[in-house]
Amino acid sequence: MGLELTLLSENEYERLSSGDMTPAMAARYLQEGEFRLRGFDEVLRSLYPKSDIQQRLAAALLEAEPASNPESVGRTVRNWINGHSKPTRSEDVFRIAFALDLSEAQTNRLLGVCTDYGIHYRNGRDVVYAWFLRTGGAYTEARDFFASLPELPQVDGATECGSSHITRELQNAFLQVHSTGELRECYIANLDNFGALHRRAYGYFRRYLDRLIHPVPAWTGLEEPDYSMEAIMELYFSMSMPSSRSKCGWSVVQRLIKYNWPNTTALKNIRNRKADVPRKLLLLLYVITENVVDGEYRETDEDYLSPRERLDDHWFAINAILTDCGMPPLDPRNATDWLVLYAVTATEESMSERMEKVIEHIFAGQ
């Protein structure tokens, strides 16, 4: 499969590749079966299995914010370790990484679990923190050093464009830095190259979205009006997903699948570069368009493929996109990822229809 999976993840992949589950069975399995969600606590303990994890985290958080309430900090750390919550701010993830002496790669993974993206090497703070992680520095050193740097120029999100190769060029430039003096020089020299939004993810988003806005290719000569964001939302993203904001009585799986589900406002903001592209949206666009944006032949369209072959092909394709965007790869023990992997094995219906059938069963009665 190209990516090493744990035994539990491998079991899920085998289950998905069997082709034996109807949408009703898939929904029931996610809701009531033996599906084992991978939580933040499991990932955290896999990166730092020692018994002093709670003490180290609490001490590090208090050192970073001496005015914090020790009881509140202790409660936050316990909730992380016991799987009741996870950090949602990348700043907190970096604090954890420094506290546990995690490597840059381990920090990248932890960020992906919490924020959709790994270290963003076009983000000024991220590259500084990554450098201090690589060189064995402390969180307070990294934070104070970053605070001493010149402010980044304000960039209008709608105009934040340019070569998508800049991120890798920046990463390579900072890998050549060997002292805080060089770090400051490199940072100042690249002030105009920094930005908050991810360009590669936006590139995929626009290609997929353009396919939905202009469903009839120009070369056909057929006339069809462009779809509005409202129409796209209704036609493609509704998928029988409950619109109510109330989640009272919902299961964990229901909450996870509903979380960050796109709406019209979100699509408009992302299109206008006012917000980043969420990982879930990118996966949904892959399913909705079936990754067909250029009309080229793809073997995944052929009926002779077995469910396993079809799943393998989409597994490689999706993971290549996610990796290119700086997002974590597919995890068969993630509820949304599992649903996406189930959808891409569709043969007699479209991927989005297959996904919608599962969602209908999962949210029946809501």
Where do the PLM segments sit?
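Recognition helix of helix-turn-helix/homeodomain-like DNA-binding domains
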Residues: 62-88, 113-116
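A short, Lys/Arg-rich alpha-helix, primarily the initiator
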Residues: 2-63, 145-156
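Short, leucine-enriched amphipathic alpha-helices that occur as contiguous helical runs
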Residues: 37-41, 74, 125
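A generic alpha-helix surface/boundary motif
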Residues: 52-55, 90-94, 126
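Long, charge-rich C-terminal accessory regions
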Residues: 158-330
